[in-house]
Amino acid sequence: LKPVLWRNPKEIPNNGIDDDKNGYVDDYFGWNFLGGKDGRNVKEDSYEAARLYHALKPKYGGTVDESKLSAIEKEEYRIFKKAQGDIEHGSTEAQSQVLFLRSLYNKSSIADSVLKEKFKPEYNGNDLVTFKPANSKDADAKSTMLALFRGFEMMDATNDFIIKEFSSYFKGQEKKAEASQIAPKDYRGEIVKDNYYDFNDRFYGNPDVMASTPFHGTHVSGIIAAARNNGIGVDGVANDVRIMSIRAVPDGDEHDKDIALAIRYAVDNGAKIINMSFGKSFSPQKKWVDDAVRYAQSKGVLLVHAAGNDGKNVDSTENFPNPNIADTKTKATNFITVGASGDPKTGGLAADFSNYGKKEVDVFAPGVKIYSTIPGGNTYGFAQGTSMASPVVAGLAAFILSYYPELSAEQVKYCIEKGAQNPNTQVVKPGSTTKEDFANFSRTGGLLNAYESIKIAATLKGERKVLSNPAPQPKPKVNKSKKG
């Protein structure tokens, strides 16, 4: 990734001076909106539903006469009731699982330790199948870890990755279990120390874009732009790309102010495509994000967003950010929402965790067993989620723009959507056991098809003013039987 990282040409790194006078000191590689001026960084955070539930509970937790509420209060009450339903139902459900998950996590950790000693320090599920246990203890360890690999449907992943994934899931369920009883800690406020509710207080954070939780961003970045054809690790989707690193999402739900300012920062510093591999079910300061989306649209910047991993229909379940501009009831034209397609060899064309929606999801792209860069120095691993599908689309958008820079954001979106391939088959609907036409899961009804999208791009007359020379026209040798 090092060769493809964006570097701010107007900033001298580590000199303690805001050389480009944009308000962000030493933003050479980008900016961290989750940092404090003292160098500390926000690592984890709470769920937005929990934040809203506990903030509004003193006002709306008892008996409420809706007829006496103002319009603003009615909207607050609606949000509270929705958050209350999510938190109280989710908490009850999680509480029933936590004891079992804690026991299974402890058992899995012990099993992994046994296998590291008796088998080998690093192994994947396929390796483990070949292990010959010498006794019942070893056999139990093998059985426990194999169940975990198969449960995550990632037999190619390493043992350390699987244990880490399970730990993350277990801790998330613990948070949900306690959410109805305990008000969440203000992780962000204790470190960032801005006036959160003043949008003009925007020059906060620090330049430490790696911070303490770089796995997700590193994996996503590699999918888009890992250096190609160097014989090392993986090839990103696109050449001639620079990754501008902006940290605005913790291990937990992001805050709307950070997202809005991150979008504006990217636009102001020349980004043409913004990948957004994050999301949540509540957006109390949606207007700030909507304004940033409109700002990006006015500057010709394409936004690519992950649809989410709840196995839900987002036509009827809210998911943020989204292209729906609340105050004008219009839809942003520079916004693509991406669902995750699965591995046909192991399950189906739609990943079982992916959100979907005939109106709100635009296209599906690969999001299961995606191999990419991870922190650690030329280290690689698997991950899955719509967070992995979104950068596949962002990478294709970057590829198209690198050869056809005169195309507008809307034209690139058109190429991607028009080129999507409808498999004309029924698949298991995410989050269920019933089958439906794959075409019902998105606006295009299709899977991303790079070959077709690039062919369409070649036919369009661009609408964007070009300030630099385009890349040479591609002349790939395409095996049409394997296109897409």
For each feature predicted by the language model, list its residue ranges.
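Structured segments of extracytoplasmic/periplasmic soluble domains
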Residues: V4, N8, I223-A227, V249, ...
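C-terminal subdomain of the subtilisin-like protease fold in secreted/lumenal serine endopeptidases
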Residues: V267-N269, I273-M276, K287, T333-T337, ...
